[in-house]
Amino acid sequence: MSPRPQIKVGVLGATGTVGQRFIELLAAHPYFALHALGASSRSAGQQYARVVRWKLPSPIPDAVRHMVVHECRPDAPGFAECGVVFSGLDADVAGDIENAFRAADLVVYSNAKNYRRDPLCPLIVPLVNPSHLSIIPYQREQLGLKKGYIVTNANCSTTGIVVPLAALEKAFGPLDTVIVTTLQAISGAGYPGVSSLDIMDNVVPLISGEEDKIEWETNKILGGVTPDNKAFDLHAPKQINVSATCTRVPVIDGHTGCVSVKFARSPPPSVAEVENAFREYTCDAQHLGVPSAPAQAIVVHDAPDRPQPRLDKNLHNGACVSVGRIRECPVFDIKFVCLIDNVRLGAATSSIINAEIAVEKGLIQ
């Protein structure tokens, strides 16, 4: 069997923290070949290594070191030949730029929040709901496009929470109520991020806009697509009641969530049944065998003091969710602690796995 031809890809926001992670993950990817880099007008026309303030522990990949950076425009050199464009743009500029690329009939897989609530755009956590890609033909039809569309991945904390919630709904039916408190790493604020005087020896009990994202996104992700593949049902007929409190803690990478769950069914499952549901959970990314999918979607920790960001965030190359401290909840039914690598599965890795799945489904060529 002949090897799969690589698909040319571009990265928008290539010099930023998410863009750097995209480049690291794509530099030696079996499906994709880096072909175009986009950044601000200040960086345009220069070699990537000259304009980027590289913040990852690995070196700048040789494949991109001497690539010329262009402005984030669909008519800039290289982008028209790309089968997919990955966006690591900040939300304050992502909306118009991503829409321009889609309007130019290009495929965009975005880490930004701008189109997560769009009724035509899938909001996909690759370990949960790639079935939502079925709305893409309708998105194209509504916008008069042949190839172009936008897919977004979720907020980084939402991603870590909905994977275990999806396992619970798959095994035991609908959830009624979820309360979560997050302890979010400083890397989630980007670079330079939170002032050291604000975060050292401290916990900041507010991340602006974060709680609303978790509360809203959960139902779009865990819901389905209508039978005609033209809308998202947002977990109809009964949405999950979700209440989130989000805090920033002095951890570099790794978002932790403390989750309490009430099931719609009565009696609820036992702790042992919940633990088994987490261990047995598998997802479409694994079944399709895409290269960035984790061997385990959920890693269950038996030690009473795990998961911990320092020890567990890198499991399965940061592409899984860790779960531990599964126990009965005296207020609801079950409570547990979950952990996600916010800079990988919580960001660039999700977009890449989403695109890998789309390749297997014939939605990227």
UniProtKB/Swiss-Prot annotation:
Regulation: Inhibited by the competitive inhibitor 1,4-benzoquinone and derivates such as 2-chloro-3-methoxy-1,4-naphthoquinone, 2,3-dichloro-1,4-naphthoquinone, 2-chloro-1,4-naphthoquinone, 2-bromo-1,4-naphthoquinone and 2,3-dichloro-5,8-dihydroxy-1,4-naphthoquinone.
Protein name in the entry: Aspartate-semialdehyde dehydrogenase
EC number: 1.2.1.11
InterPro entries referenced in this protein's UniProt entry, alphabetically: ASADH-related, Asp-semialdehyde_DH_CS, Asp_semi-ald_DH_pep-lack, NAD(P)-bd_dom_sf, Semialdehyde_DH_NAD-bd, Semialdhyde_DH_dimer_dom
Gene3D superfamilies documented for this protein: Dihydrodipicolinate Reductase, domain 2 (3.30.360.10), NAD(P)-binding Rossmann-like Domain (3.40.50.720)
Top-rank EC class of the record's enzyme: oxidoreductase
GO cellular component: cytosol; nucleus
Similarity field: Belongs to the aspartate-semialdehyde dehydrogenase family.
Role this protein plays: Catalyzes the NADPH-dependent formation of L-aspartate 4-semialdehyde (L-ASA) by the reductive dephosphorylation of 4-phospho-L-aspartate. Mediates the second step in the biosynthesis of amino acids that derive from aspartate (the aspartate family of amino acids), including methioinine and threonine, the latter of which is a precursor to isoleucine.
Chief place where the protein resides: cytoplasm
Organism: Cryptococcus neoformans var. neoformans serotype D (strain JEC21 / ATCC MYA-565) (Filobasidiella neoformans)
Quaternary structure and partners: Homotetramer; dimer of dimers.
MF GO annotations: aspartate-semialdehyde dehydrogenase activity; NAD binding; NADP binding; protein dimerization activity
Transmembrane segments: none
Pathway of action: Amino-acid biosynthesis; L-methionine biosynthesis via de novo pathway; L-homoserine from L-aspartate: step 2/3; Amino-acid biosynthesis; L-threonine biosynthesis; L-threonine from L-aspartate: step 2/5
Keyword vocabulary terms for this entry: Amino-acid biosynthesis, Cytoplasm, Methionine biosynthesis, NADP, Nucleus, Oxidoreductase, Threonine biosynthesis
